């Protein structure tokens, strides 16, 4: 804290000490007097914050006021002042204190003093601080104990580096500070390595990205801890009291210092507001806090973006800037501390670049001034030379300082467009270098459309990264699919991506697939226009241009078809194949879709979704090879699959006439949706089912491929009231996630229902026979009397799901062909949803004849084909309105109540 700031704090003091001490002397209860003083401090500082006072005065001012309160509390007890000192450590030791931050104290004792002799004073002092609601963290150590613990734990050593005496013998503090900062405790090298390791672990916990949708102001990359790490190392190695001192050592420029200071003050302001508005120590920008903070800082919704998205965009941009500085300065420190004594090994790459002790470096400082294209060339060289460990700090700074050269002329320079395409075609390092280009601010300038999506959040649960971070992850996933370790999890994608004739077209499509977001309108259409223009500017051929633009425009087509449509229907496959046009388009689209889903939110990818995607790909590929002019005839398809199933049944000795008689009672949908093997197994089990009063339940896995498949539960029973409600409610109680429901009603009053389920962890059920038998028996017991089906389990709905709950929408229409009412339900996904919908149907005596279950992100789009008690579509308009209203009301109310 500067002398000027200290003087300003004294002049704007909140608590008048003489008056405060007089009030304490006169009071019967000192605790209430202390509490009132602290409340006065909180209220006054909060008012000043709301009125726009300099955040530094507030953060330092709070620590300064609390110092005075603690000193007075200390003086109420008897201490041997020459043998004890009260030390402020950590953030409080720096003189910084946010509204709800911990107040970390060290009671430092002379080695000749035993803590037991001060037990009453220590206990009374700390109890007083807790009683007056100060959030105090404390430790009591002798000088030697303190030194030994600091040697063993870098966190304790760091806390002592940032420490100051509040009251007591300051010489004790000076002595321990000298010992802890000596080479005997931690050498500069050891300390730097420990802080690097600490930061790496901290970043790993936050997915190594600044762009988490609920970032931590302290611990996420680009957060306050990254700035503090710079300060700790600077203080330990360079003796710098402030980061400003690094300017004198030529480690930081004045411009960089200004950016660092502004970034820190911004994070301080957000953290102060977060503590104040939440009323607790909170450093996570949780979704509900983001909205409150956006409103507090004056952001307003616009047509293009929500207020919360604007607020978070600013946060992300500042975080990425601070993270970039952290990288650069730690690289500087690495060179100054770890590599200072290394032999300087320099290997020229060309006239502009060289490798300096394993790191890329410009050959001379004015390289970018004389050869602006070198700003692009640097990343190509890094990709072409994977043994290079990174970029020298001085070169990172030069790249930053010369970014202004990336202008329209730069973008139109054939050397730069050629270099960028060379990077896209590089066999190694594409993902790493595109990410590095983004980090150093080059990509957003080279592709202005990409620059506009940097830091743009998507305020939902479907996307867990910002648009730019997601885009970089899609490119990374496309790269990873080439590697052998991904062959088992993604066999088709792995094979395809290694056979694509021009892999660079896939990367370009990935780069542009979401680039149109945030502008209003269809982002796929907008992105396709940008992608086509890019391809022209980079001199790609006509076919290549059209392929890339088509991929961007249709990047959602395959996932939407697989998730929302009945891909067992030959008409659906033919329509999709017509849109895709040829196998090469299909191959590119399949890989892009797989990468997109996995880079959007890894929890979205499960074994069932993998199965759907594989089936859509293989069926479409078969249709394309057969020729679009030769679509599959449904009758031919049904006849073929019946022949195959009948062949299997004959081998088992099943009477053909009995089979055909049974099949005559079943509609065509069953034979279009099921495989010959499934039809054979179902038919055999039904014909051999002797306990006709009880439901027949069969459980099988849909695939034995690793990472694919789900568990199918087939139920054959009398078609009676509440069957659907009882089934889904029982499955909910068994913690089964229903992915798909195929409901077929026979002409003889029975139902053939097939439910595709996953376990709670989104994998097929265990093949443990005891577990499967338990599930089977539970279903038989409950469905034997579906009138008395189990209650719906009340499960806790995740906090984020409640925050992003959008109103349920229900659409009803009558299908004249099937003579059924179609009920479409669009609602936020949550545990027990189908069970609740089934209960509503049951109360209205509706029978579910067919259902299509589809989860799209955090929402479901489910279709139910129902009939009334007379097996007819709902004809009463008033009943339709009442049903629509009741579904919306019950689902929305229960989402908030659970």
Report residues per predicted region:
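Hydrophobic alpha-helical scaffolding
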Residues: 115, 166, 181-189, 213, ...
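Active-site-adjacent "gating/activation" loops or surface patches in catalytic cores
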Residues: 87, 94-103, 347-362, 370, ...
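Regulatory modules associated with amino-acid/nitrogen control
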Residues: 266-267, 306-360, 430-432, 440, ...
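Conserved catalytic alpha/beta cores of large enzymes that bind or transform nucleotide phosphates
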Residues: 134-138, 147-150, 406-417, 421-424, ...
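Divalent metal-dependent catalytic cores for phosphoryl transfer on phosphate-bearing substrates
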Residues: 95-121, 248, 262, 466-467, ...
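Non-catalytic interface/linker regions that flank or bridge core catalytic/transmembrane domains
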Residues: 1-89, 95-97, 101-463
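Alpha-helical phosphate/pyrophosphate-handling elements in metalloenzyme active cores
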Residues: 61-87, 233-248, 255, 464-506, ...
């Amino acid at each position: 804290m500067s002398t000027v700031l200290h003087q300003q704090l004294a002049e704007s003091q909140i608590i008048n000490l003489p008056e405060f001490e007089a009030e304490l002397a006169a009071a019967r209860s000192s605790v209430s007097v202390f509490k009132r003083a602290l409340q006065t401090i909180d209220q006054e500082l909060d008012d000043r914050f709301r009125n726009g006072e300099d955040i530094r005065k507030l953060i330092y001012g709070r620590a300064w006021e609390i110092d005075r309160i603690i000193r007075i509390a200390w003086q109420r007890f008897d201490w041997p002042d020459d043998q004890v000192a009260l030390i402020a450590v950590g953030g409080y030791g720096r003189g910084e204190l946010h509204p709800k931050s911990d107040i970390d104290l060290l009671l430092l004792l002379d080695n000749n003093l035993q803590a037991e002799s001060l037990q009453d004073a220590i206990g009374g002092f700390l109890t007083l601080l807790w009683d007056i609601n100060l959030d105090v963290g404390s430790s009591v150590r002798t000088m030697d104990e303190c030194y030994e613990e600091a040697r063993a734990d870098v966190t304790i050593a760091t806390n002592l580096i940032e420490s100051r005496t509040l009251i007591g013998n300051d010489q004790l503090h000076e002595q321990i500070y000298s010992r802890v900062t000596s080479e005997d405790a931690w050498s500069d090298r050891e300390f730097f390595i420990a802080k690097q390791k600490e930061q790496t672990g901290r970043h790993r916990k936050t997915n190594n990205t600044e762009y988490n949708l609920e970032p931590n102001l302290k611990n996420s990359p680009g957060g306050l801890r990254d700035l503090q790490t710079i300060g700790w190392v600077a203080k330990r190695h360079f003796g710098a009291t402030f980061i400003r001192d690094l300017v004198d050592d030529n480690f930081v420029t004045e411009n960089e210092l200004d950016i660092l200071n502004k970034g820190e003050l911004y994070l301080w302001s957000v953290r102060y507001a977060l503590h104040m508005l939440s009323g607790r120590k909170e450093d996570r920008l949780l979704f509900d806090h983001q909205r409150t903070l956006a409103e507090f800082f004056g952001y307003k919704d616009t047509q293009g973006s929500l207020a919360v998205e604007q607020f978070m965009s600013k946060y992300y941009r500042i975080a990425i800037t601070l993270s970039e500085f952290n990288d650069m300065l730690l690289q500087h420190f690495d060179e100054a501390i770890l590599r200072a004594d290394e032999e300087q090994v320099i290997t020229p790459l060309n006239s502009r670049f060289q490798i300096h002790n394993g790191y890329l470096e410009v050959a001379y400082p004015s390289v970018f001034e004389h050869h602006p294209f070198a700003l692009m060339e640097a990343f190509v060289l890094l990709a072409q030379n994977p043994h290079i460990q990174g970029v020298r700090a001085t070169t990172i700074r030069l790249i930053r300082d010369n970014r202004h050269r990336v202008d329209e002329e730069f973008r139109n320079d054939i050397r730069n467009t050629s270099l960028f395409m060379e990077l896209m075609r590089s066999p190694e390092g594409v993902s790493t270098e595109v990410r590095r280009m983004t980090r150093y601010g080059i990509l957003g300038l080279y592709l202005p459309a990409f620059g506009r999506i940097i830091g743009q959040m998507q305020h939902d649960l479907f996307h867990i990264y910002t648009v730019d971070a997601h885009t970089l992850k899609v490119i990374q996933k496309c790269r990873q699919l080439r590697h052998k370790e991904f062959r088992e999890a993604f066999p088709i994608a792995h094979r395809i991506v290694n056979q694509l004739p021009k892999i660079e077209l896939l990367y370009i499509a990935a780069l542009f697939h979401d680039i149109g977001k945030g502008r209003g309108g269809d982002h796929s259409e907008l992105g396709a226009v940008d992608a086509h223009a890019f391809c022209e500017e980079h001199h790609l051929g006509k076919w290549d241009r059209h392929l890339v633009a088509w991929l961007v425009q249709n990047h959602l087509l395959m996932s939407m078809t697989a998730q929302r449509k009945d891909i067992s229907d030959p008409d659906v496959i033919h329509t999709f194949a017509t849109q895709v046009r040829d196998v090469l388009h299909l191959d590119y689209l399949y890989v892009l879709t797989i990468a997109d889903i996995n880079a959007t939110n890894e929890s979205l990818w499960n074994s069932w979704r993998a199965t759907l995607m594989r089936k859509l790909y293989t069926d479409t590929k078969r249709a394309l090879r057969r020729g679009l002019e030769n679509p599959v005839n449904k009758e031919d398809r049904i006849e073929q699959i019946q022949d195959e199933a009948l062949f299997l049944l004959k081998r088992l000795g099943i009477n053909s006439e009995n089979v055909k008689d049974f099949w005559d009672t079943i509609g065509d949908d069953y034979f279009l949706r099921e495989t010959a093997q499934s039809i054979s197994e179902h038919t055999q089990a039904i014909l051999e089912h002797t306990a006709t009063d009880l439901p027949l339940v069969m459980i099988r896995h849909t695939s034995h491929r690793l990472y694919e498949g789900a568990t199918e539960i087939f139920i054959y029973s009398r078609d009676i009231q509440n069957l659907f409600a009882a089934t889904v409610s029982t499955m909910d109680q068994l913690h089964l996630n229903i992915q798909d429901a195929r409901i077929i009603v026979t002409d003889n009053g029975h139902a053939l229902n097939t439910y595709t389920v996953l376990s709670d962890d989104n994998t097929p059920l265990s093949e443990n026979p005891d577990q499967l038998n338990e599930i089977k028996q539970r279903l038989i017991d409950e469905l034997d009397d579906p009138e008395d089906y189990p209650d719906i389990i009340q499960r806790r709905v995740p906090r984020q799901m409640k925050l992003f709950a959008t109103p349920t929408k229900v659409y009803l229409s009558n299908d004249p062909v099937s003579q059924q009412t179609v009920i479409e339900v669009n609602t936020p996904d949550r545990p027990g949803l189908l069970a609740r919908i089934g209960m509503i149907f049951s109360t209205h005596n509706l029978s579910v004849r067919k259902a299509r279950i589809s989860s799209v992100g955090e929402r479901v789009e489910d279709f139910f084909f129902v009939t009334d008690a007379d097996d007819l579509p709902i004809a009463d308009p008033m009943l339709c309105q009442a049903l629509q209203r009741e579904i919306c009301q019950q689902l929305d109310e229960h989402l908030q109540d659970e």
